[in-house]
Amino acid sequence: MMSESEARPTNFIRQIIDADLDSGKHKSVHTRFPPEPNGYLHIGHAKSICLNFGIAQDYQGQCNLRFDDTNPEKEDIEYVESIKNDVNWLGFDWSGEICYSSNYFDKLYGFAVELINKGLAYVDELSPEQMREYRGNLTEPGKPSPYRDRSVAENLELFEKMKNGEVEEGIMSLRAKIDMASSFMVLRDPVIYRVRFATHHQTGDKWCIYPMYDFTHCISDALEGITHSICTLEFQDNRRLYDWVLDNITIDCQPRQYEFSRLNLEYTVMSKRKLNQLVTDNLVSGWDDPRMPTVSGLRRRGFTSASIREFCKRIGVTKQENTIEMSSLESCIRDDLNENAPRAMAVLDPVKIVIENFTGDTEVLTVSNHPNNSEMGTREVPFTREIWIEREDFREEANKKYKRLVLGKEVRLRGAYVIKAERIEKDAEGNITTIFCSYDNETLGVNPSDGRKVKGVIHWVSADAGLPAEIRLYDRLFTVANPAAADDFVTVINPESLTVLNGFVEPSLKVAEAEKAFQFERIGYFCVDSKDSSAEKLVFNRTVGLRDTWAKMGE
């Protein structure tokens, strides 16, 4: 049995936390997961969820779920609910009530007034284009706005007008007065408030000025008593603004921000803007399309929460930016389902077999649900005179390497008997329509008594009792490993990312619940689609194949 220290992952953030606790800097750990509710969570967010909530669990601390909801035009209660569901599904609970940055709008306004009174914020009337021009660039310092030296009284009056709805959008903004010559662009008098006449999903029409993320985030952390504010590397420079705000307002708590590398995954995109475009342009069926990297999309495809947590554990937490191969994610779900998914049989491209010497009624066979786990029990599988097999599992002629059914030769049916292909029937186009076979009724669970060798084993489904099913084969959404690098990422969408087949599954699957996973023997891992499947129309999604196919795709 692993000790607690062996069971815990280790990384540089946990080392910082250990040092803070050992030194007495903090008596306990308080983290947070602060998504903006402007889209569905993706697997990159799952990494942050596992990190922040995992730290709170391991250190017996707290982790808040906080919605950084300062942009009402792009946010929606639909996204709030989906995020809550995703966090719970991944196996985590937040501490106390859900937090919203909008809960702090009154206090944030007060802190903005404090900065004005200290001469550290001013109301600017530069247009966005002028502001960009005045800001300079990485090689040239910015120049001060002509409104930078307004008096405190004038700034207070104008900011009050902004709050009261007396100023149109885009005419005025409140900027922090820091350093227009700073080598860090984020410190060149950033905007901290702007006018927006938009209804907010939490506060309604109470406010028409909204704080910017960089101003809101650090103050929300402080108000909630966050000890370790963990975010991705793109916010590394923003830490200077994070610290500046907290250093210049009257607030008790002074959290520290720490950055780690975000998750980049091959053959997909993580940008919410790009993901939203895929949805709004109907290039996918929705945020939960099984080809999407969203948590809901992965869940619908058949990924388990345990497999995603294991993936996040395997890739670790570092400051090194890298791109993870899709095979790494798929290996986690393959390992999970290989151990935990019951087996079943399905035929995706059926051709009929007639067993001519089978003359009795339906024979009910007892088949194991898992070859290595007897506790999963058994199921009843009907064996009938007519069955379906995969079209690719039969050839009229084949070499010795082909271990399936060949005309004039034998093969074993999984969990059933040995059959021999005697003759075939074709249609006018030359396609095989029926394979006529004989069976050895003394080979159920045993080898032929005369010692003849039958090497191949194929799966099958009763033609009389099998259930028609729609089988959705999902592939990578893009044809290139880094679609974000394309001039237009839409042009590299994989036109073959979804193939829909109509096949047959064994009758035991009729009562399978939504999201239930199975290994379709010899094919791959599939799950019951959570939206479209019903008792009248079964729909299964391929989660992953039995073997890694990504190495071949990369060649």
From Swiss-Prot:
Lineage top rank: taxon: Bacteria
Molecular function GO terms recorded: ATP binding; glutamine-tRNA ligase activity
GO cellular component terms, A-Z: cytosol
Catalytic activity: tRNA(Gln) + L-glutamine + ATP = L-glutaminyl-tRNA(Gln) + AMP + diphosphate
Alphabetical list of PROSITE patterns matching this protein: AA_TRNA_LIGASE_I
Motif 'KMSKS' region mapped to chain: 269-273
Entry-linked InterPro entries: aa-tRNA-synth_I_CS, Gln-tRNA-synth, Gln/Glu-tRNA_Ligase, Gln_tRNA_ligase_bac, Glu/Gln-tRNA-synth, Glu/Gln-tRNA-synth_Ib_cat-dom, Glu/Gln-tRNA-synth_Ib_codon-bd, Glu_tRNA_lig_a-bdl
Location of the motif 'HIGH' region: 35-45
UniProt entry keywords in alphabetical sequence: Aminoacyl-tRNA synthetase, ATP-binding, Cytoplasm, Ligase, Nucleotide-binding, Protein biosynthesis
Gene3D superfamilies in UniProt: Glutamyl-trna Synthetase, Domain 2, Glutamyl-tRNA Synthetase, Domain 3, HUPs, Ribosomal Protein L25, Chain P
Subcellular location, record wording: Cytoplasm
Keyword hit for Cytoplasm: yes
Positions that bind ATP: 36-38, 42-48, 232, 262-263, 270-272
Location, primary (coarse class): cytoplasm
GO biological process, one term: glutaminyl-tRNA aminoacylation
Record flagged with keyword Aminoacyl-tRNA synthetase: yes
EC number of this enzyme: 6.1.1.18
Binding site for L-glutamine: D68, Y213
Pfam families hit by this protein: tRNA-synt_1c, tRNA-synt_1c_C, tRNA-synt_1c_C2
Record-linked HAMAP family: Gln_tRNA_synth (MF_00126)
Family per record: Belongs to the class-I aminoacyl-tRNA synthetase family.
Subunit composition and interactions: Monomer.
Protein name: Glutamine--tRNA ligase
Name of the coding gene: glnS
